[in-house]
Amino acid sequence: MTIIVTGAAGFIGSNIVKALNQRGITDIVAVDNLSKGEKFKNLAECEIAHYLDKHEFIRQVREHILPYQNIEAVFHQGACSDTMNHDGLYMMENNYQYTLDLLNWCQDERIPFLYASSAAVYGKGEIFREERELEKPLNVYGYSKFLFDQVLRRRMKEGLTAQVVGFRYFNVYGQHEQHKGRMASVTFHHFHQYREHGYVNLFGSNDGYGNGEQTRDFVSVEDVAKVNLYFFDHPELSGIYNLGTGRSQQFNELAAATVNACRAAEGKPEMSLKELVEEELIRYIPFPDALKGKYQSFTQADITKLREAGYKEEFFDVKSGVDRYVKWMLENLA
């Protein structure tokens, strides 16, 4: 049985491939666009059966000529995740139409389809629950994800031929994101800031939040891969699910966890947030004008629906997840 993973050389996709490998599954077709060549490193430690260029894959899907038999599932992680990309034509073709074509093909072939949605569909809302009236995306990236989620809702009412699951990822961090540049997680950037300069920067006050007090639902990519595989194991489950921890933690906590993990590797003692700020190991910079009115200052996944679907595993909190990630970066990127 073959499994297809799109975006397989990317951040979340490569972690799903790795998680499948840990189960002994290697009959995997990895689909990606390696024009950004350094992404190959994410697959170098993985076992796959074949690599297929994204554009060739799309052509074969649209023409119904994919040569693989007995496809067990498609994990669709290939998309543009740059929330600052305002090219609507590109975003809608890459995120919406590509996903729609894959959905149609999977439904025709009765293949389970698990895809990446995003918490960006909620915009600046304060309630993050999988309900239409709570969804007001702020940018074309969020809209592209939102629009496809509406397609799934309609298809579910009409009746599905095979499982379809959309995961609304919250703030994901962890190994294999180094190719993402400015779109990599704050933890990734703080690790390199601290290693280079001996301190990290956070946004100052904005939108009623104090220095570094903006909060997000930070979720480890290890947990994201686990949830994907849980639904792979339960093909009777379909729908749209938030994928976060259900906790909202301050950027201050994230920065402190990163700095203290780096300090621990240097044999230095843990410091409190107050001490880190006083010693200027955490510094605050003015909030950028370009982000005002477009920035989610608070996110917290309502994971009631995920729990009701039977997923019982605990999620890493910021400290434990960041500790694991920093150790990985020290071993692989430093």
Curated annotation (Swiss-Prot):
Pathway: Nucleotide-sugar biosynthesis; ADP-L-glycero-beta-D-manno-heptose biosynthesis; ADP-L-glycero-beta-D-manno-heptose from D-glycero-beta-D-manno-heptose 7-phosphate: step 4/4. One of its GO terms (biological process) is carbohydrate metabolic process. It is an enzyme of class 5 (isomerase). Keywords: Carbohydrate metabolism, Isomerase, NADP. CDD domains: ADP_GME_SDR_e. Binds 1 NADP(+) per subunit. The keyword Isomerase applies. Its EC number is 5.1.3.20. The keyword Transferase does not apply. One of its GO terms (molecular function) is ADP-glyceromanno-heptose 6-epimerase activity. Substrate binds at residues 171, 182, 189, 203-206, 216, 295. Disulfide bonds: none annotated. NADP(+) binds at residues 11-12, 32-33, 39, 54, 77-81, 94, 145, 172, 180. It holds the Pfam family Epimerase. It catalyses: ADP-D-glycero-beta-D-manno-heptose = ADP-L-glycero-beta-D-manno-heptose. The active site is at residues 141, 180. SUPFAM superfamilies: NAD(P)-binding Rossmann-fold domains. Homopentamer. Catalyzes the interconversion between ADP-D-glycero-beta-D-manno-heptose and ADP-L-glycero-beta-D-manno-heptose via an epimerization at carbon 6 of the heptose. This is ADP-L-glycero-D-manno-heptose-6-epimerase. It comes from Neisseria meningitidis serogroup C / serotype 2a (strain ATCC 700532 / DSM 15464 / FAM18).
